[in-house]
Design a protein with these regions (language model features):
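Active-site neighborhoods and metal-handling regions in enzymes and metal-associated proteins
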Residues: 1-269
Length: 269
Protein backbone atom coordinates (compact mmCIF):
# COMPACT_ATOMS: atom_id res chain seq x y z
CA UNK A 1 0.00 0.00 0.00
CA UNK A 2 1.29 3.46 -0.90
CA UNK A 3 2.10 5.50 2.20
CA UNK A 4 0.92 9.07 1.64
CA UNK A 5 2.42 11.84 3.75
CA UNK A 6 0.82 14.81 5.46
CA UNK A 7 2.53 18.23 5.34
CA UNK A 8 3.69 17.67 8.92
CA UNK A 9 5.15 14.27 8.07
CA UNK A 10 6.95 15.75 5.09
CA UNK A 11 8.66 18.20 7.43
CA UNK A 12 9.57 15.34 9.75
CA UNK A 13 11.22 13.49 6.87
CA UNK A 14 13.54 16.33 5.90
CA UNK A 15 16.24 15.71 8.55
CA UNK A 16 16.79 12.18 7.24
CA UNK A 17 17.15 13.49 3.69
CA UNK A 18 19.64 16.14 4.75
CA UNK A 19 21.63 13.60 6.76
CA UNK A 20 21.92 11.03 3.98
CA UNK A 21 22.59 13.68 1.35
CA UNK A 22 25.31 15.26 3.47
CA UNK A 23 27.10 11.95 4.01
CA UNK A 24 27.07 11.10 0.31
CA UNK A 25 28.28 14.57 -0.63
CA UNK A 26 31.18 14.28 1.82
CA UNK A 27 32.08 10.81 0.56
CA UNK A 28 32.04 11.94 -3.05
CA UNK A 29 34.40 14.78 -2.19
CA UNK A 30 36.84 12.71 -0.11
CA UNK A 31 36.89 9.30 -1.82
CA UNK A 32 40.06 9.02 -3.91
CA UNK A 33 42.57 6.58 -5.33
CA UNK A 34 43.71 4.38 -2.44
CA UNK A 35 40.54 4.73 -0.38
CA UNK A 36 39.52 1.32 0.95
CA UNK A 37 35.87 0.26 0.73
CA UNK A 38 35.97 -0.79 4.39
CA UNK A 39 37.09 2.73 5.30
CA UNK A 40 34.00 4.10 3.58
CA UNK A 41 31.82 1.66 5.51
CA UNK A 42 33.41 2.64 8.83
CA UNK A 43 33.01 6.34 8.01
CA UNK A 44 29.26 5.84 7.57
CA UNK A 45 29.06 3.70 10.72
CA UNK A 46 30.60 6.50 12.78
CA UNK A 47 28.26 9.09 11.27
CA UNK A 48 25.26 6.99 12.27
CA UNK A 49 26.55 6.36 15.79
CA UNK A 50 27.19 10.07 16.30
CA UNK A 51 23.73 11.13 15.12
CA UNK A 52 20.95 10.88 17.69
CA UNK A 53 17.94 8.99 16.40
CA UNK A 54 19.79 7.55 13.38
CA UNK A 55 19.72 3.86 12.49
CA UNK A 56 21.13 1.93 9.54
CA UNK A 57 18.53 0.44 7.20
CA UNK A 58 21.07 -2.06 5.88
CA UNK A 59 22.55 -3.88 8.88
CA UNK A 60 20.77 -7.25 9.31
CA UNK A 61 18.55 -6.53 6.30
CA UNK A 62 17.83 -9.78 4.45
CA UNK A 63 15.92 -9.19 1.18
CA UNK A 64 14.64 -12.11 -0.84
CA UNK A 65 17.10 -11.31 -3.64
CA UNK A 66 20.10 -11.82 -1.34
CA UNK A 67 21.71 -14.84 0.30
CA UNK A 68 21.74 -13.65 3.89
CA UNK A 69 21.62 -10.62 6.19
CA UNK A 70 23.59 -7.57 5.07
CA UNK A 71 26.33 -6.76 7.58
CA UNK A 72 27.45 -3.29 6.47
CA UNK A 73 26.29 0.33 6.59
CA UNK A 74 26.58 1.26 2.91
CA UNK A 75 26.56 -0.47 -0.48
CA UNK A 76 29.77 0.03 -2.47
CA UNK A 77 29.50 -1.11 -6.10
CA UNK A 78 32.65 -0.79 -8.21
CA UNK A 79 32.96 -1.06 -11.99
CA UNK A 80 31.03 -4.14 -13.20
CA UNK A 81 29.05 -4.46 -9.96
CA UNK A 82 25.48 -3.51 -10.79
CA UNK A 83 24.26 -2.65 -7.30
CA UNK A 84 24.15 -3.82 -3.67
CA UNK A 85 27.93 -4.18 -3.57
CA UNK A 86 29.28 -5.36 -0.21
CA UNK A 87 32.24 -3.38 1.20
CA UNK A 88 35.39 -5.52 1.34
CA UNK A 89 39.14 -5.08 1.56
CA UNK A 90 39.69 -3.31 -1.74
CA UNK A 91 41.54 -0.05 -2.32
CA UNK A 92 40.18 2.02 -5.18
CA UNK A 93 42.31 2.46 -8.29
CA UNK A 94 42.59 5.26 -10.82
CA UNK A 95 39.60 5.09 -13.16
CA UNK A 96 37.35 3.00 -10.91
CA UNK A 97 33.67 3.81 -11.28
CA UNK A 98 32.08 3.83 -7.83
CA UNK A 99 28.43 3.80 -6.79
CA UNK A 100 27.66 4.48 -3.14
CA UNK A 101 24.15 3.61 -2.02
CA UNK A 102 22.94 4.64 1.43
CA UNK A 103 19.71 4.31 3.40
CA UNK A 104 19.33 5.61 6.96
CA UNK A 105 16.37 6.07 9.26
CA UNK A 106 16.31 9.24 11.38
CA UNK A 107 13.63 9.41 14.07
CA UNK A 108 11.68 6.72 12.26
CA UNK A 109 11.79 8.23 8.76
CA UNK A 110 13.87 6.70 5.97
CA UNK A 111 15.98 8.46 3.35
CA UNK A 112 17.54 6.33 0.61
CA UNK A 113 19.88 7.69 -2.04
CA UNK A 114 22.99 6.96 -4.09
CA UNK A 115 25.71 8.75 -5.99
CA UNK A 116 28.11 7.55 -8.68
CA UNK A 117 31.45 8.96 -9.77
CA UNK A 118 34.82 8.04 -11.22
CA UNK A 119 37.88 8.02 -8.96
CA UNK A 120 41.19 9.49 -10.09
CA UNK A 121 42.34 11.52 -13.06
CA UNK A 122 41.83 9.04 -15.89
CA UNK A 123 38.08 8.45 -16.29
CA UNK A 124 36.82 6.21 -19.06
CA UNK A 125 34.72 8.41 -21.41
CA UNK A 126 32.08 5.69 -21.52
CA UNK A 127 31.77 5.80 -17.73
CA UNK A 128 31.25 9.55 -17.85
CA UNK A 129 28.71 9.10 -20.62
CA UNK A 130 26.64 6.61 -18.67
CA UNK A 131 26.68 8.85 -15.60
CA UNK A 132 25.49 11.72 -17.81
CA UNK A 133 22.72 9.49 -19.15
CA UNK A 134 21.47 8.70 -15.66
CA UNK A 135 21.62 12.35 -14.63
CA UNK A 136 19.52 13.33 -17.62
CA UNK A 137 17.07 10.49 -17.00
CA UNK A 138 16.67 11.63 -13.40
CA UNK A 139 16.08 15.25 -14.40
CA UNK A 140 13.59 14.26 -17.09
CA UNK A 141 11.64 11.99 -14.75
CA UNK A 142 11.52 14.69 -12.08
CA UNK A 143 9.77 16.93 -14.60
CA UNK A 144 6.92 14.44 -14.96
CA UNK A 145 6.78 13.31 -11.31
CA UNK A 146 3.77 15.37 -10.33
CA UNK A 147 0.16 14.77 -9.27
CA UNK A 148 -2.06 13.67 -12.13
CA UNK A 149 0.65 11.83 -14.04
CA UNK A 150 0.92 8.08 -13.80
CA UNK A 151 3.89 5.98 -12.79
CA UNK A 152 4.08 4.78 -16.38
CA UNK A 153 4.87 8.36 -17.41
CA UNK A 154 7.85 8.40 -15.06
CA UNK A 155 9.08 4.97 -16.16
CA UNK A 156 8.60 5.75 -19.84
CA UNK A 157 10.59 8.95 -19.48
CA UNK A 158 13.50 7.07 -17.92
CA UNK A 159 13.45 4.48 -20.67
CA UNK A 160 13.31 7.11 -23.41
CA UNK A 161 16.50 8.76 -22.18
CA UNK A 162 18.31 5.42 -21.99
CA UNK A 163 17.20 4.56 -25.51
CA UNK A 164 18.43 7.91 -26.80
CA UNK A 165 21.87 6.98 -25.47
CA UNK A 166 21.65 3.48 -26.91
CA UNK A 167 21.70 1.64 -23.58
CA UNK A 168 19.60 -1.48 -23.00
CA UNK A 169 17.40 -1.30 -19.91
CA UNK A 170 17.45 -3.71 -16.98
CA UNK A 171 13.97 -4.09 -15.49
CA UNK A 172 14.94 -6.48 -12.71
CA UNK A 173 15.18 -3.65 -10.21
CA UNK A 174 13.54 -0.23 -9.98
CA UNK A 175 12.58 2.68 -7.79
CA UNK A 176 10.36 2.31 -4.77
CA UNK A 177 8.48 4.17 -2.10
CA UNK A 178 10.10 5.17 1.19
CA UNK A 179 8.66 6.36 4.47
CA UNK A 180 8.73 4.41 7.70
CA UNK A 181 10.29 1.50 5.80
CA UNK A 182 13.06 1.40 3.23
CA UNK A 183 11.31 -0.54 0.48
CA UNK A 184 7.68 0.49 0.15
CA UNK A 185 5.07 0.78 -2.57
CA UNK A 186 4.95 1.56 -5.38
CA UNK A 187 7.61 -0.11 -7.49
CA UNK A 188 8.84 2.27 -10.21
CA UNK A 189 10.32 0.37 -13.18
CA UNK A 190 13.09 1.83 -15.31
CA UNK A 191 10.83 1.66 -18.35
CA UNK A 192 7.12 1.60 -19.03
CA UNK A 193 4.22 2.81 -21.14
CA UNK A 194 3.18 6.44 -20.89
CA UNK A 195 -0.23 7.05 -19.30
CA UNK A 196 -0.27 3.47 -18.00
CA UNK A 197 -0.02 2.40 -14.35
CA UNK A 198 -2.03 0.90 -11.56
CA UNK A 199 -2.26 4.27 -9.84
CA UNK A 200 -1.57 7.95 -10.37
CA UNK A 201 1.08 9.95 -8.57
CA UNK A 202 -0.70 11.57 -5.63
CA UNK A 203 -0.02 14.42 -3.23
CA UNK A 204 2.05 13.31 -0.24
CA UNK A 205 3.57 10.33 -2.01
CA UNK A 206 7.30 10.07 -1.61
CA UNK A 207 9.47 7.88 -3.77
CA UNK A 208 12.92 7.66 -5.20
CA UNK A 209 12.45 8.72 -8.73
CA UNK A 210 14.15 7.79 -11.90
CA UNK A 211 17.38 6.22 -12.09
CA UNK A 212 16.63 4.93 -8.69
CA UNK A 213 18.18 1.70 -9.66
CA UNK A 214 19.57 2.57 -13.00
CA UNK A 215 21.17 -0.46 -14.66
CA UNK A 216 22.04 1.23 -17.89
CA UNK A 217 25.08 -0.68 -19.00
CA UNK A 218 23.73 -4.18 -19.31
CA UNK A 219 24.74 -5.65 -22.65
CA UNK A 220 22.74 -8.14 -24.72
CA UNK A 221 23.09 -11.56 -23.13
CA UNK A 222 24.51 -10.19 -19.89
CA UNK A 223 21.58 -11.13 -17.72
CA UNK A 224 23.62 -11.00 -14.54
CA UNK A 225 24.56 -13.22 -11.66
CA UNK A 226 24.29 -12.92 -7.89
CA UNK A 227 27.43 -12.93 -5.77
CA UNK A 228 27.42 -13.60 -2.00
CA UNK A 229 25.08 -11.36 -0.01
CA UNK A 230 23.20 -8.98 -2.32
CA UNK A 231 25.78 -7.96 -4.91
CA UNK A 232 24.61 -8.08 -8.51
CA UNK A 233 27.20 -8.41 -11.25
CA UNK A 234 27.01 -8.85 -14.99
CA UNK A 235 27.32 -12.39 -16.29
CA UNK A 236 29.70 -11.14 -18.98
CA UNK A 237 31.89 -8.25 -17.97
CA UNK A 238 32.12 -5.43 -20.50
CA UNK A 239 34.62 -2.65 -19.94
CA UNK A 240 33.64 -0.80 -16.82
CA UNK A 241 29.98 -0.89 -16.00
CA UNK A 242 27.77 1.34 -13.94
CA UNK A 243 24.15 0.54 -13.39
CA UNK A 244 22.73 2.59 -10.59
CA UNK A 245 22.63 6.32 -10.15
CA UNK A 246 20.42 8.68 -8.22
CA UNK A 247 22.62 11.69 -8.27
CA UNK A 248 21.83 14.81 -6.25
CA UNK A 249 18.02 14.73 -6.19
CA UNK A 250 16.61 11.23 -6.02
CA UNK A 251 13.87 11.52 -3.41
CA UNK A 252 10.67 13.29 -4.33
CA UNK A 253 7.80 14.43 -2.17
CA UNK A 254 4.61 14.92 -4.16
CA UNK A 255 2.61 17.95 -3.06
CA UNK A 256 -0.42 19.49 -4.68
CA UNK A 257 1.60 21.16 -7.43
CA UNK A 258 5.32 20.50 -7.73
CA UNK A 259 7.47 17.68 -6.35
CA UNK A 260 9.84 18.52 -3.50
CA UNK A 261 13.41 17.31 -3.38
CA UNK A 262 13.79 15.14 -0.31
CA UNK A 263 17.52 14.40 -0.23
CA UNK A 264 19.76 17.44 -0.01
CA UNK A 265 23.22 16.82 -1.36
CA UNK A 266 24.42 19.30 -3.96
CA UNK A 267 21.53 21.63 -3.25
CA UNK A 268 21.68 22.72 0.37
CA UNK A 269 18.01 23.24 1.13
Amino acid sequence: MIELKTPREIEEMKPAGRFVGGILKELQETTKVGTNLLEIDEFVHKKIVDRKGAESCYVDYAPDFGTGPFAHYICTSVNDAVLHGVPYDYSLKDGDLVSLDLAISVDGWVADSAVSFVVGKDPDPEDLRIIKCTEEALAAAIDVAKPGNRLGDISNTIGDVAREYGYPINLEFGGHGVGHIMHGDPHVPNDGRAHQATSCAKAGHRHRTVVPQDHRRDLPGSEGRLDPACLRRLARRPLRAHHRHHRERPDRLHRSHQPLIGVWRMVGA
